[in-house]
Each structure stands twice: as structure tokens, then as C-alpha cells.
């Protein structure tokens, strides 16, 4: 009625087509694996440097960086679950 059916269908298709760059990269399995391993290696490096100990300013910056990488891992996991 009043052409509402067509507009709803167009909105659904438009929402499917709007993907972030990261989501587009995650559709390619080789890039997805590369991104996951890269993030995992960076998390391990930051964790190792935190264990070594450093000044308070450096510790806080590294802790913030580690929190960002962990958040990125969560986002990547959610993207992978959404794609399946």
C-alpha cells in the first residue's frame, strides 16, 4: 500500500551493501587469516613488554594499546560469526 513494500525491500538491500572496509577484508579468507594472525602477534608482543616492566607512563600507554587490540579481536570474532 502506498508503495511501502518496495521501499522496505530497498532499505534491506541497502543495509546489506553498506559494509565497512574491515568487513570487506574479512570476506576474503586469506586476508582474514592474515589480519587475525597480525593482531594476535601484536597482542603477544604488547603482553610480553608489559611483563618485562617499564615506567608508569609507558605501562599505561601499553595497557591502553593492549585493550584496543583485545577489542579489535572481539570485533573480528563478531564479524566472523556474522558471516557464517
Curated annotation (Swiss-Prot):
Belongs to the chlamydial CPn_0711/CT_665/TC_0036 family. It holds the Pfam family DUF5398. This is Uncharacterized protein TC_0036. It comes from Chlamydia muridarum (strain MoPn / Nigg).
Amino acid at each position: 500500500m502506498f508503495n511501502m513494500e518496495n521501499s522496505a525491500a530497498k532499505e534491506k538491500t541497502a543495509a546489506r551493501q553498506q559494509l565497512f572496509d574491515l568487513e570487506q577484508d574479512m570476506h576474503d579468507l586469506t586476508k582474514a587469516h592474515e589480519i587475525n594472525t597480525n593482531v594476535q602477534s601484536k597482542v603477544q608482543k604488547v603482553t610480553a613488554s608489559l611483563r618485562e616492566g617499564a615506567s608508569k607512563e609507558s605501562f599505561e600507554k601499553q595497557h591502553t594499546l593492549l585493550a584496543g587490540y583485545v577489542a579489535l579481536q572481539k570485533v573480528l570474532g563478531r564479524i566472523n560469526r556474522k558471516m557464517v
